[in-house]
């Protein structure tokens, strides 16, 4: 990580990271889901973790109430974990799906982040990410399932933070993602809206928070996959909105720390969650 600060609130950063993405429980489970006799799914206990190498150049300009960050990045991932689908050898009318380390992928993109403190009671964070992604050829059990593919995608995220008082805050978050290349096809666009309220008591020792996810009941996963002998549309609904009420108490000077995620990590996680669905 290298950083250089110029006069008049200009800053240039160069950052290299290597991230390990380990397979999740459902992706590893060998249990066969046969609730749909024509679509059988199961995990792969022999999955290896993904290794993602990222190189990023950031330019940051700050004003009194505004910050603008522009990033150019390159990401190279090996042993990409994705779902693979194929016709059953026992019955060609039955589709089987599992997970495998299918390929290598590359992404080159630009990310813009704007933070604006408009009033004392409102600040906005806007993120736009545009990238070109290339996925290598998909091979499963020495069989070529799909040739290499590529495509342009973009995502955006708007987060509004409201300050109603010293101990009362609120948040609205909206996200959108365009269609995206996956192992054997593409995902369709997605969008979502989340709300949150937080109230603190006893000098911020006691915190009460209410979260409403997927307010518009729009959070679904729609993928289209194809091969030499099949074409399939798959759509999963979350059946929202989802409500959660949390009460936390902090002892002493303990302050929980949460590593902030970039817009790219947020959307990658969303895609992973949708991709490991079995029902």
Describe every region a protein language model picked out:
Residues 42-44, 48, 54, 63, ...:
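Outer membrane beta-barrel strand-and-loop segments of large Gram-negative receptors
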Residues 14-18, 53, 70-76, 126-132, ...:
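Transmembrane beta-barrel strands of outer-membrane/channel proteins
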